[in-house]
């Protein structure tokens, strides 16, 4: 066997007949498979042991030689070699075909490679190959052109006129002769000459033909090898035949297909020996051709061959294709050993890095480890004995199991695994019951809940795998989300509610204004019921020993609440005392106004002071997230995870103590709701009157009505929130961020508002009732539309989003950080991303965590804030924006010069760790997951505002797909291709609008539809590529008009726009990585003196290499233009044929690769997974695995003896 980790590339090509024979261990002559009585393979049949090897290990067929000692012997009775039965997976056979047969991939694929090479149409080829016409191979004196087709009658006529003086053949034989006569060098010269003169269709065809001829010439494949004389037979274990209960056999379809080929081939041989009439032989040859076609690709031509029950048989091509094919089913995704799955339950007592494993499951998973330990401790005498102990579940087994699982992490995975946080490592602890216990804080990362979700457990076996699981995958290490660098393990639901309740303050709380000496007194008083959690009290500031308090402050009393004192105990000591939910308090110091000088208090003491003070907001989910981020920035990951655990415990404890619950009485209907509705009803009547008088159009009326009712709902919502008691349980749930929001509350107590019809158009009749009052029948009916559409959308969205992620991963999987610095001289100019006046992504967020490309000085003081190639930390980013700088050049994946992947400097910091990114990080996959994972949160809808076609804009998931697939967008904007001034805007025919732009040398007019809004004015100066009407720009056109940089920035902005509008934050760098992959290729315009072909797609680096070579030899360089490919197209155009074939269109990719004799250098991740190597990323990178050890220091003993001498 080959050592998988030790080969560097994989090459594919056409197999010559000699090659096929060299692979084979013998010819299969009979169609028989297994003798049904003896169940032994038939001799010379499809399962023959003499050809493929023995069915039993170390035993020949007749049983003369058994046991290993005869290894390598060939039995003299049955001719079977004594060896392992595994060879039946490796040894191939062959069939000697009685007539040449064409390979369907090369004749039928699009474009037909045979057709291009012979310059014949696929129709003509088909007629020849399937014996409908003759093709002239050697015209002789007939005056016919070579390759002319002759019908049966024409052939007879010529044959009678010129007997034996010309050659015309039928079937693959004729084509084979023509292919053998091709002189590739001669063809190449002719085609190169034709390129100079041809135009239009002829030029395109010439380029296509040139490509095929070049492919054959460079790869060393001979054209005639596209015709088969010998057919290889794959090893029998790969097309098995198994006996079912009841004596019937189940067999792979391939055996049926091979059997048909062998039967027809043998019949043809017999007919040829008998000298049968030509027409019978021809028919048999055609049937043989069809049998081989069905074997290679059933159903590609004509009706597929069917098995029992009219089911089309699965041919060799089908074995590779699609989700169930070899690539995706067996090579890219395998089932794994040492795994289990079960329902998950919450484990609130677990630490951040732990999970609970059911005892039985743990015993089964760690069985071999336990057995080894039992034998080592001499509890069991041997392995067999240990096994039976485990099966009996003896008492001593559990102690050993405890020992074995200590320090041995396991991986937990929840499907669907949308991003890398869908698999994390935990240290197992044994639990009773049969459910896996999961830490409540990691549920957000897994998107898990405990309503019956299941999770899978995997055991990392090797020491290296365990080390990686512990160092890199442990849940306590994965606190930040790779998509935006914010904490992903934020408390949710109960935990949020508990901490919110804990930090709440109330005016009417018991013993407000009591003053205590220290926190211990406070806790005692709370335990004895003297004060409540919400009581506002004073504590001597000096008792806190807080390093951020000034001397002045330590002499005073800190005004706070009992709950906040308890909350602050979980915060690290070096932090300021957190008394209010502000960044100022969190990052710097406790505001001075909370420190009270006891001498200034009046007679009422602190109680009087509190009566005049406003209550402080409690801590909501967002603020808890900020606390976690701040702790993470200042401390180690370990400290952060410990604090998270404490926050979790606090949350659960106090949400239980609070006993918050919801009853009907908590939903208070707004008293003056009817009044608000009446006012808006009057406004609607006014609009209707205006419409009836013809003052406004139907469209304006509809939009006005929708606006009025939206405003009514907003007003009711605003007043509801004002009128609510701050301790109302529903308000607390929504305000804390635990569950629900203001809009849910409005629907419960205010009004439901406007609903959408099934078409997506908003129904102008609002639902004025709330759920508390109850809906009328009509209102209920209207609301069912939305609910139904919501459910249907969710189902579709999940599938769509998953497919988008798959395409994204595929296009970016080979982007890995390959070097420290690529030394580029270009940078990307960044500033705020705005849409009109609305801010989409601020400048400060875009530069933080990136490397600068220029020196930035403070505009006033002229001090240097940052130099080129330095990392922009949050502090520096703040300095830059505070200095009033609004744009700067940064290093970006767009401008990176790294050949494969990106470099550290152009990528910036790794968002998952907050440190600089390391060489070997698979940033492409991370980018794809970061963009794909929130896909399910995006909406599916195209919003219809009043059914006007012009103003429908695609948003959400469809828009993201549109951008990444580089499709023509819906609602396309008109852009100007010249720089100049808008000269005129006028109505054109067919209700269109015409915009005239006058440039320096030319004037152009652009047509826009009558409904589209024009956003330029007459006399306004416009740049190339500027938008004239509202809508989305078509990116491919924009690339040719505005150039590469503008297109990159535009695509980035558009993606950010969609995600940010849905409230999803994704870092720019992920989008940059994806867009860069879409712009990797250029299309050659003129080849110059290089070897490139005009019109072909070439990787940008190959193009620059070819030109560099040309310049070196003082030759003419090639010219090219950048091309924007959609992600599907870009995946299929990658340099690696293994990656492309396992993605989509498997047969097309492999056909093309075989003809070109492509070699795959295994640079990406997929290729290496397919052939079973370690992936070249992370610890699998060659620079990490090829570490050489050198002893530089002398052994200690030697050093000591020398020191004695010198003394």
Swiss-Prot record:
Which cofactors are named for this entry?
A: Mg(2+); Zn(2+)
Q: List cellular component terms (GO).
A: DNA-directed RNA polymerase complex
Q: What class of enzyme is it?
A: transferase
Give the binding site residues for Zn(2+) 2.
822, 896, 903, 906
The organism sits in which domain of life? Bacteria
Enzyme Commission number, as recorded? 2.7.7.6
Record-linked Pfam families: RNA_pol_Rpb1_1 (PF04997), RNA_pol_Rpb1_2 (PF00623), RNA_pol_Rpb1_3 (PF04983), RNA_pol_Rpb1_4 (PF05000), RNA_pol_Rpb1_5 (PF04998)
Give this protein's Gene Ontology molecular function annotations: DNA binding; DNA-directed RNA polymerase activity; magnesium ion binding; zinc ion binding
Q: Which UniProt keywords apply?
A: DNA-directed RNA polymerase, Magnesium, Metal-binding, Nucleotidyltransferase, Transcription, Transferase, Zinc
Catalytic activity annotation: RNA(n) + a ribonucleoside 5'-triphosphate = RNA(n+1) + diphosphate
Q: Which Gene3D superfamilies match?
A: 1.10.132.30, 1.10.150.390, 1.10.1790.20, 1.10.40.90, 2.40.40.20, 2.40.50.100, RNA polymerase II, clamp domain, RNA polymerase Rpb1, domain 3
What the protein does comes down to: DNA-dependent RNA polymerase catalyzes the transcription of DNA into RNA using the four ribonucleoside triphosphates as substrates.
Oligomeric state and interaction partners are given as: The RNAP catalytic core consists of 2 alpha, 1 beta, 1 beta' and 1 omega subunit. When a sigma factor is associated with the core the holoenzyme is formed, which can initiate transcription.
The name this protein carries in UniProt is DNA-directed RNA polymerase subunit beta'
Species whose genome carries this gene = Staphylococcus aureus (strain NCTC 8325 / PS 47)
